[in-house]
Amino acid sequence: MSEPEVIFEDWSPVCNINAFVEKSDACYYFYLWVNPQSDSAVVKSCWIGNIGNSPEELDIEAMGEGIAPRMPKQYVLHDEEGLDLDPDRFEIVWFEEGNAAALLYDDEIISVIPGWSGYNGFNGYARYAKGITPLAWGLLDAYDTISKRVEESKAFWSEFEEDFWTKAQSMHLAALESFFGKYEKYYAIDGGKFPPKALVRGSKKGVVYGITAGVSLIPMPNVDTVYGDEFKEYRRIELGFAVTEEKESLCNSVFSFMSGLAAFPWREDTFLAHGHTVPINFIEGFEAVLFISPRRLSGVETPEYKDYMGEKINLLWMVPVTGAEYQFITKHDIDENLSYAYDIERIHIFDGKSKFIGMP
């Protein structure tokens, strides 16, 4: 038996994920290799089709040896002689978040590895699979939902073929300058890579602000796992930090942290939201930042953004918290945590002091 051969591949536009199709003597498989060549690498797989006759039973022994097995006959929808696929007719459509993909053949969806692949024994969907199997679930059962996501993703990525950043940048700067006046500094934080991102500094009434622009261009992964049908309301974010002028010496270290954090959701295949925390080590006496959303907390100021691609942009203010507060916050829900805040309308403005009183 010859070694399997990679016959087609592509890379996610925003995540460190390699998508490829592998052909063996027995079958074709679609793979997503997440963070390849790293300690955190994960491989997601989905059967595409068999080559030659289909077996009566699943080859468990081959699976145990790491060999991609053929699908048993009772779960196969393609012809008995199997598939013979031309690599030049493949196309990969990345989902909007960049962490999931559909494989097309002659413009028809034949295999899909969505963001929820890997949970509860689910690998992905395949056009030629029937029912629920260990190798793939039947695509026909989910076709309406999946095909809609694929069409939306095609339209989404086509938006970036034009001079999109000039328009998006102008929208962000207009929102920020309406909030704090003429901006003072503009930092590119994308490292020259897609998507473009910036951090904009401004000030008003004795407070210095640093707010990102462009993080919201790409929706964050896996927001639907928490927000369900409302996930599109919360999957686009910008990050903000506000500090009194007396403490503005912190800005360089905080802005550097924000620059790295701006890529965090796509690097780690996760999302940031109201009530989440991230550890820090650059503000003495404080061990983490708590994210709060003005959309979820009445009275807290925010720039007023226009919708982007028909979706809301959510600013997340970063609120530094002490070690004891961090331990409490991670064990309780956000509403209970915020009940200890002593000045909710200025909770986002850091002055070197804790914003909470009386946390047990």
Predicted regions and their residues:
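Short linear motifs embedded in intrinsically disordered, proline/glycine-rich low-complexity segments
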Residues: 1-360
